[in-house]
Design a protein with these regions (language model features):
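Extreme N-terminal starter segment of soluble prokaryotic enzymes
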Residues: 1-4
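Two-component/phosphorelay signaling modules centered on CheY-like receiver
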Residues: 17-26
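Short hydrophobic/Thr-rich beta-strand motif most characteristic of the beta2 strand and flanking loop
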Residues: 26-32
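Short amphipathic alpha-helix with an adjacent loop that forms part of the alpha/beta core around
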Residues: 35-44
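Cysteine-nucleophile active-site neighborhood
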Residues: 43-118, 181-182
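Catalytic beta-strand/loop cores that center a nucleophilic Ser/Cys/Thr
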Residues: 114-160
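Phosphate-binding/catalytic loops
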Residues: 159, 164-175
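Acyltransferase
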Residues: 172-196
Length: 196
């Protein structure tokens, strides 16, 4: 399984790379200011991940382009934290400031589809962010996949293989995180009930 990791200059990227490596993925890591999306699309990736990062989607280099064009090419793409925000913005959503949350655990509820398949309905996840996706103007092309503490914790594109999570599945504060990443790697973003 060949995976592209877009590194938004964040230390959590290394945790994602480590987990996916342990799960058997062949990973190419590209910094957000060093890749050409057209060339990357031609490299035969099976999956793509847009990593967390300290900036906004507008300052995340190729992240917005990858999170839009890879799913449009049929490549299952996961956005984590900043990547989640980039996914929403790439398809017309709004990212807004939020009270900073760093190293906090929250309980979320989810829809049991795609990366959440087979997990308990209520999950504890680790959060590190100061921006969120605004729910009030979430584009119709998305469905909400998880929520917690009054914040969108996950969104999924209704027709393309693209999903975002505000929390950090690669954090030790997210006990089920590695299982979520394993499901993404093995199943892409195909739900157990056949829907996306």
């Amino acid at each position: 399984m060949k995976l592209l990791m877009v590194d938004n200059y964040d230390s959590f990227t290394y945790n994602l790379v480590q987990y996916f490596g342990e799960l058997g993925a062949q990973i190419d890591t590209v910094r957000n200011d060093q890749g050409d999306v057209g060339e990357l699309l031609g490299k035969g990736y099976d999956r793509a991940v847009v990593s967390p990062g300290p900036c906004t989607p507008d300052h995340a280099g190729i992240s917005l382009d990858v999170i839009k064009r890879f799913p449009e090419a049929g490549i299952a793409t996961l956005g984590v934290c900043l990547g989640h925000q980039a996914l929403a913005q790439a398809f017309g959503g709004t990212v807004v400031r939020h009270k900073p949350v760093h190293g906090k655990t929250s309980q979320i509820t989810h829809d049991a589809k795609t990366i959440y398949a087979g997990l308990p309905t209520a999950l504890v996840v680790g959060r590190y962010h100061s921006l969120i996706v605004a729910e009030e103007d979430l584009p119709e092309c998305f469905e909400v996949s998880s929520r917690g503490d009054g914040v969108l914790m996950g969104i999924r594109h209704r027709t393309l293989p693209a999903e975002g999570v505000q929390f950090h599945p690669e954090s030790v504060l997210t006990p089920s995180g590695k299982q979520m990443l394993a499901t993404f790697l093995s199943d892409g973003l195909n739900s157990t009930d056949g829907s996306r």
